[in-house]
């Protein structure tokens, strides 16, 4: 049975003692990292979230404490009182390596079984074990550093927004389901049988209502929920830094957030963010990088060869151009000697993105080698090489297809090759704003337009008339902040005119009745003088991944779910009592085979 503290107070953390503390009598508390018994002396490394310090117990120091210390094992939770002294053999690998604690008294606060995982940095254990014993995984120093980074990030964000006149305000977690986009998590109501709340995918509508309410600068750090198929770095619940401002335009939101990003990255990670951050229209991002989340740490931009081969009789090029598509290519330097098997793998790769194939031209010292050379005239080959600014050693990779297929396949191939060739500078942080997104996309299956972001996004002023004539060409006052090929956050200016908002719902295929059924409270609010407003939200978890230097989102969330949205620690979701279901008016239906 563990000993009680009985008024004993911790006076210093394990990672704090330095030479200026020599001679002080202190009490430390923490977990035993390891113990070494050298006969007349016992050394214990004691750990807490600030670091590790060495404690020495000896018969000459205190016989009772010495004998008691021999009983401790790894992960025992103990308290030790003694004097800080200069260490005879300093350990330069430890922050506290110049000193040690002479253990004069020890309390064993609780014992520990042998842990199923090692509590050390760089743990090599299965994800399932780490999640099942997450409370042990979180003791590891590298994990604790991550959550100190997370805490500091939130503090810097709060301080910055407070200094800039923002109010931290909460919005509801139990809200109304407005199915548009990802699936909602639904919560049955006991008071209203057969009816459900939804957990918010974002605070979007409520923060707009706060603007109508006159709270012109709002923010919160909040949980959001999406019941979607999980990819590698997605979680069913995630944290968002959310903000909204009134009486502003795009430039105001962007300028404020550039200053916020510069402050966060400098104060938390010592990273300088060059301001102003580059802005790139969506159209340019797709044409040059094949992605609305371009990684700018390396070149290999996409080039348009359509003009160069517009008169070609090569049926692959000709067919793509006649169908309204294009012929585009990327250039991989020093890859002309790439073997046929490697190129075949690249062809298989682009086919996963619906490309029909991958043409290639290898610019070698003594020849230009290509399986399509026989289908091209000398002038066409020369035009391609000139357009690509090709040099000896270059490998040109070409896709001819519909534009969306060309962009997606070459964009993915560009990233794939950059990783394979190891040409990405992992120490570089390249930010870019992507602007002028399409407002809408057409859903062929449903026969209607869908909002690319959400139905409250404002249109670019010069495109308003296109909403009646050609909705697919309308651009949005939307902006995403991208870092090293990952979306860090995104936002937009919102529609604040009730008639325009109703018109938008109509374009999206909502009847007036349906729009009022789902969003009536917002449309009603817009009758009462809504201000021009807009905002932005960051994925906090993804931001911490960059600041902490980890590629796994589960590392930055205290108790994450696994790839199947299951928690190995608590075993949630779980079967609930039939009485609970009955109280909610819910009956389980057994699935037929």
Swiss-Prot record:
The keyword Nucleotide-binding applies. It is found in: Cytoplasm. Homodimer. L-aspartate binds at residues 180, 226, 453, 494. It comes from the Bacteria. Keywords: Aminoacyl-tRNA synthetase, ATP-binding, Cytoplasm, Ligase, Nucleotide-binding, Protein biosynthesis. It is an enzyme of class 6 (ligase). One of its GO terms (cellular component) is cytoplasm. ATP binds at residues 226-228, 235, 487, 539-542. Its EC number is 6.1.1.12. It catalyses: tRNA(Asp) + L-aspartate + ATP = L-aspartyl-tRNA(Asp) + AMP + diphosphate. Catalyzes the attachment of L-aspartate to tRNA(Asp) in a two-step reaction: L-aspartate is first activated by ATP to form Asp-AMP and then transferred to the acceptor end of tRNA(Asp). GO terms for molecular function: aspartate-tRNA ligase activity; ATP binding; catalytic activity, acting on a protein; nucleic acid binding; transferase activity. InterPro entries: Aa-tRNA-synt_II, aa-tRNA-synth_II, aa-tRNA-synth_II/BPL/LPL, Asp-tRNA-ligase_1, Asp-tRNA-ligase_1_N, Asp/Asn-tRNA-synth_IIb, AspRS_core, GAD-like_sf. The keyword Ligase applies. Residues 204-207 are annotated as: Aspartate. One of its GO terms (biological process) is aspartyl-tRNA aminoacylation. This is Aspartate--tRNA ligase. Belongs to the class-II aminoacyl-tRNA synthetase family. Type 1 subfamily. PANTHER family: ASPARTATE--TRNA LIGASE, MITOCHONDRIAL, ASPARTYL/LYSYL-TRNA SYNTHETASE. SUPFAM superfamilies: Class II aaRS and biotin synthetases, GAD domain-like, Nucleic acid-binding proteins.
């Amino acid at each position: 049975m563990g000993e009680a503290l009985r008024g004993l107070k911790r006076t210093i953390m394990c990672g704090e003692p330095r030479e200026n503390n020599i001679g002080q009598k202190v009490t430390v508390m923490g977990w035993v990292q390891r113990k070494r018994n050298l006969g007349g002396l016992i050394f214990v490394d004691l750990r807490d979230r600030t670091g590790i310090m060495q404690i020495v117990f000896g018969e000459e120091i205190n016989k009772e404490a010495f004998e008691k210390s021999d009983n401790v094992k790894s992960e025992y939770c103990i308290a030790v009182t003694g004097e800080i002294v200069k260490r005879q053999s300093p350990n330069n690998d430890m922050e506290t390596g110049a000193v040690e604690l002479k253990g004069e008294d020890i309390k064993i606060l609780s014992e520990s079984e042998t842990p199923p995982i090692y509590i050390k940095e760089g743990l090599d254990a299965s994800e399932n074990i780490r999640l099942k014993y997450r409370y042990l995984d979180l003791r590891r120093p590298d994990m604790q550093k991550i959550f100190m980074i997370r805490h500091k990030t939130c503090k810097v964000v709060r301080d910055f927004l407070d200094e800039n006149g923002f109010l931290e305000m909460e919005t509801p977690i139990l809200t109304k389901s407005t199915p548009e986009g990802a699936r909602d998590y639904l919560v049955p109501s006991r008071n209203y049988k057969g009816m459900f709340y939804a957990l918010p995918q974002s605070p979007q509508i409520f923060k707009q209502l706060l603007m109508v309410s006159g709270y012109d600068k709002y923010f919160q750090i909040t949980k959001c929920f999406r019941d979607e198929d999980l990819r590698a770095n997605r979680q069913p619940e995630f944290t968002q830094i959310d903000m909204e401002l009134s009486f502003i335009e795009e430039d105001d939101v962007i300028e404020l957030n550039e200053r916020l990003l510069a402050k966060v990255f400098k104060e938390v990670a010592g990273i300088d963010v060059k301001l102003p951050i580059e802005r790139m229209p969506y159209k340019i991002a797709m044409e040059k990088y094949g992605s609305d989340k371009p990684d700018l740490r390396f070149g290999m931009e996409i080039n348009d060869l359509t003009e160069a081969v517009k008169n070609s009789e090569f049926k692959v090029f000709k067919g793509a151009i006649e169908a309204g598509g294009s012929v585009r290519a990327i250039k991989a330097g020093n890859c002309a000697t790439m073997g046929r098997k490697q190129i075949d793998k690249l062809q298989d790769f682009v086919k996963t993105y619906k490309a029909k194939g991958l043409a290639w031209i290898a610019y070698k010292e003594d020849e230009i080698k290509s399986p399509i050379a026989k289908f091209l005239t000398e002038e066409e080959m020369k035009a391609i090489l000139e357009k690509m600014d090709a040099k000896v050693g270059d490998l040109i990779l070409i896709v001819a297809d519909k534009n969306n297929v060309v962009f997606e396949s070459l964009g993915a191939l560009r990233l794939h090759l950059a990783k394979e060739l190891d040409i990405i500078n992992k120490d570089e942080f390249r930010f870019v704003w992507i602007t002028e997104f399409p407002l809408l996309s057409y859903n062929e299956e449903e026969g209607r337009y869908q909002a690319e972001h959400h139905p409250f996004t404002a249109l670019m002023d010069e495109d308003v008339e296109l909403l009646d004539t050609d909705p697919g060409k309308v651009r949005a006052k939307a902006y995403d902040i991208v870092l090293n090929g990952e979306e860090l956050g995104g936002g937009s200016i919102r529609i604040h005119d009730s008639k325009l908002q109703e018109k938008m719902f109509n374009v999206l295929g909502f009847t007036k009745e349906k729009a009022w059924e789902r969003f009536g409270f917002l449309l009603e609010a817009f009758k009462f003088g809504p201000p021009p407003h807009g905002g932005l939200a960051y994925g906090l978890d993804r931001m911490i991944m960059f600041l902490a230097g980890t590629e796994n989102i589960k590392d930055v969330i205290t108790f994450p779910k696994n790839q199947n949205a299951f928690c190995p620690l608590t075993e949630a979701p779980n079967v609930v009592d039939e009485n609970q279901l009955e109280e909610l008016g819910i009956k389980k239906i057994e699935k037929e085979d």
